[in-house]
């Protein structure tokens, strides 16, 4: 039995089928109805005081737009090209462990939804199905693979070789989990995800250093992303090691508490990289306006983790596709109202520092939700 009343929009029950979702609020509301308290808190929670989680949202809410007018925006193009593929949106569905908590088939409906819509998916190494099974289930999807290091050099190299052999277009090392954080929502309920229960060998992650990056770049021909970059200094080191993708992330506020918001970090990373690598970013990106802000600030791809989980829990593959359709509509409208006909036209001149209009929390971008986020 669910511990909370169902979460609904302010005036209407949530739709029964994915095609009937009219906004992202309704997807989240349906996910809440379908999830037990533990799995819900796994999505919405962060580390310790959840300061980093809230700063992610506050940083996005602290950017306002500077629109231009009297420009032809009768046709707006939201697409980009990365990893040799045209994507309908500059979006990668970010690596999330234990997706099987939100759907019995885990990452499979996500990858199939990504293929159906036309964006990228990054599979977590602590998620079902494994990389071979997902490749078999969604051979034509744009698949990337993210690894938590739980073994020695040979173990890591084996994962790279398997990813290459099964058609993954990129390989990602997560580097901000040298120690596992205190996620106090989970601790309070003695809840341990399936991904955490089966994972061993965390000492290898704690000992990880730049020699692993150097070895991967020397031995393998696959685009490499480093996930967890939060400073200009580390971005420069990564680029000096030949890393193709700098992934700005604080693990969604789920690792180091009292960190900066991801989009606060982005400008210094963009300046440090100076065009020598592409940039991904995640951390509270959940609306089309958030995606536009990230691209204007210098990112190339925007990772979306929590929205992926909500969509998966709401309606499986169809929910993922509908979530992406709604995001595309939001991005297209935002660009048109900014006076911009394509993402390539965006730059920092379209952004302005401003005071947030609401107190930030993980779902403060969805004011129509009936949610007391502070009690669980």
Regions found by a protein language model. Give the residues of each.
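An N-cap/entry alpha-helix motif that binds or orients negatively charged groups
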Residues: 2-84, 183, 192-203, 207-208, ...
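Conserved active-site and cofactor/substrate-binding residues in soluble primary-metabolism enzymes
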Residues: 22, 47, 51-55, 105, ...
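Glycine-rich active-site/cofactor-binding loop and its immediate structural neighborhood
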Residues: 87-129
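Short, basic, glycine/proline-bearing loop/turn elements
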Residues: 92-98, 141-148, 198
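Alpha/beta enzyme core
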Residues: 98, 111-112, 133-137, 151-281, ...
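A gly/proline- and charged-residue-enriched helix-loop-helix capping module
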Residues: 116-137, 141-156
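A compact, surface-exposed functional segment
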Residues: 293-320, 353-357, 370-376
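Internal helix-turn-beta structural module
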Residues: 317-358
């Amino acid at each position: 039995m669910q511990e909370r009343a169902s979460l609904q929009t302010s005036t209407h029950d949530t739709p029964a089928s994915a095609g009937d979702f009219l906004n992202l609020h309704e997807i989240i509301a349906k996910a809440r109805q379908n999830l037990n308290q533990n799995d819900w808190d796994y999505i919405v929670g962060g580390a310790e005081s959840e300061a980093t989680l809230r700063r992610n949202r506050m940083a996005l809410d602290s950017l306002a737009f500077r629109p231009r007018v009297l420009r032809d925006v009768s046709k707006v193009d939201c697409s980009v090209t990365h990893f040799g593929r045209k994507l309908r949106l500059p979006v990668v569905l970010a690596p999330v462990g234990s997706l099987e908590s939100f759907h019995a088939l885990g990452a499979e409906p996500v990858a199939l939804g990504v293929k159906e819509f036309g964006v990228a998916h990054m599979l977590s190494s602590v998620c079902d199905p494994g990389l071979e099974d997902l490749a078999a289930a969604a051979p034509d999807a744009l698949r990337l693979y993210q690894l938590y290091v739980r073994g020695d050099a040979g173990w890591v190299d084996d994962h790279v070789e398997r990813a290459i052999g099964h058609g993954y277009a990129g390989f990602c090392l997560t580097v901000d989990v040298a120690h596992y954080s205190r996620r106090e929502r989970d601790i309070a309920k003695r809840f341990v995800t399936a991904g955490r229960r089966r994972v061993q060998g965390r000492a290898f992650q704690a000992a990880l250093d730049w020699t692993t990056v150097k070895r991967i770049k020397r031995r393998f021909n696959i685009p490499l992303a480093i996930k967890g970059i939060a400073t200009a200094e580390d971005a420069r080191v990564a680029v000096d090691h030949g890393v193709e993708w700098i992934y700005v992330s604080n693990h969604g506020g789920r690792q180091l508490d009292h960190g900066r918001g991801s989009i606060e970090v982005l400008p210094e990373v963009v300046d440090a990289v100076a065009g020598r690598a592409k940039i991904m970013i995640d951390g509270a990106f959940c609306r089309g306006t958030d995606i536009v802000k990230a691209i204007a600030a210098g990112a190339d791809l925007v990772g979306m983790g929590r929205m992926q989980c909500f969509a998966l829990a709401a309606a499986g593959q169809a929910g993922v596709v509908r979530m992406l359709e709604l995001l595309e509509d939001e991005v297209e409208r935002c660009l048109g109202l900014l006076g911009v006909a394509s993402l390539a036209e965006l730059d920092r001149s379209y952004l302005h520092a401003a005071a947030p209009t609401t107190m930030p929390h993980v779902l403060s971008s969805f004011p129509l939700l009936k949610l007391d986020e502070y009690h669980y």
